[in-house]
């Protein structure tokens, strides 16, 4: 499974990125790359937390795809 990262620039210039398949997983950054890196790290933490609590997670080979 691939997680889709949607990214857009806010009016204040910051970038907001969100993992569409993981509700609530979003992050800001001063640049596109920073916002993407932050949301990828957060998504991996969420997935690790789910695994720790015995929840199933989708099989992952190519984890992220970025869209604008």
What does each of the following model-derived ranges do?
Residues 1-4, 37-68:
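Short, charged, surface-exposed hinge/linker loops at domain edges
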Residues 7-22:
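Short aromatic-glycine-(Arg/Gly/Cys) micro-motifs in beta-strand/loop hairpins
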Residues 23-34:
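A short, exposed loop/beta-hairpin motif centered on an aromatic-Gly-Thr core
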């Amino acid at each position: 499974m691939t997680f889709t990262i949607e990214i857009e620039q806010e009016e204040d210039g910051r970038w907001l990125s969100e993992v569409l398949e993981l509700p609530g997983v979003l992050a800001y950054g001063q640049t596109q790359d920073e916002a993407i890196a932050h949301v990828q790290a957060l998504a991996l933490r969420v997935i690790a937390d789910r695994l720790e609590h015995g929840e199933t997670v989708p099989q992952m080979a190519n984890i992220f795809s970025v869209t604008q």
